[in-house]
């Protein structure tokens, strides 16, 4: 494996679109929205130069921010450790003062009522352990919005039978749009 910082934009885009955790925050277009930030794209390649992991880093005054990144196989703890170790070295080399990471993989799934016992319900403690072993500090599994800069929870609704559950008026409006 090799850590790189000169990823071809097409290779980067192809990789993120195939990744289960791809979000707009790691897309090249996000750097156009955040045009008052600098950015870097880093990654890990195998011996055949195939991307195994990547991240788009937004940079402002020494702060490096990976919104919903890195993108990689979070079941591969060896890869995660390799990425984090090399990201830290790269950040130090480039004089970053802070590296903030909001990983895209949920550490817990469930209803809000059960989140009070989060440490017991974590989907995969290995991810947190990988970050801790690479000297990243975890802000904790807080419950209040005021404790963090980003929202802690994402509301997700399953869309099975979604069209059937819409009100009649909404269904009619959707049909009108389809006819246009």
Place the predicted regions along the sequence by residue.
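Short amphipathic alpha-helix that is part of the acyltransferase structural core
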Residues: 1-28, 179-180
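Short Pro/Gly-enriched beta-strand edge/turn motifs at strand-loop
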Residues: 22-29, 36-38, 137
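Short amphipathic alpha-helical segments and helix-helix/interface helices
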Residues: 13, 31, 81-84, 88, ...
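Conserved donor-binding loop and adjoining core beta-sheet/short helix segment
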Residues: 31-117
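Short, solvent-exposed loop/turn elements at beta->coil junctions and helix N-caps
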Residues: 28-33, 142-144
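Amphipathic coiled-coil/heptad-repeat helices and related helical stalk/stem segments
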Residues: 26, 83-84, 170
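Catalytic cores of TIM-barrel enzymes
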Residues: 84, 91, 103-147
């Amino acid at each position: 494996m090799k850590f790189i910082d000169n990823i071809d934009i097409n290779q980067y885009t192809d990789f993120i679109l195939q990744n289960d955790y791809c979000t707009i925050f790691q897309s090249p277009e996000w750097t156009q929205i955040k045009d008052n930030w600098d950015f870097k794209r880093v990654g890990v390649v195998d011996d055949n130069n195939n991307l195994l992991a990547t991240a788009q880093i937004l940079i402002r005054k020494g702060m490096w921010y990976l919104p919903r990144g890195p993108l990689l196989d979070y079941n591969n703890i060896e890869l995660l450790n390799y990425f984090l170790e090399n990201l830290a070295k790269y950040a130090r080399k480039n004089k970053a003062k802070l590296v903030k990471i909001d990983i895209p993989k949920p550490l817990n799934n469930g209803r809000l009522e059960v989140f009070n016992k989060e440490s017991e319900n974590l989907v995969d403690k290995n991810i947190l352990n990988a970050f801790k072993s690479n000297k990243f500090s975890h802000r904790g599994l807080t419950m209040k919005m005021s404790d963090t800069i980003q929202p802690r929870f994402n509301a997700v609704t399953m869309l099975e039978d979604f069209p059937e559950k819409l009100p009649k008026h909404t269904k009619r409006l959707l049909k009108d749009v389809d006819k246009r």
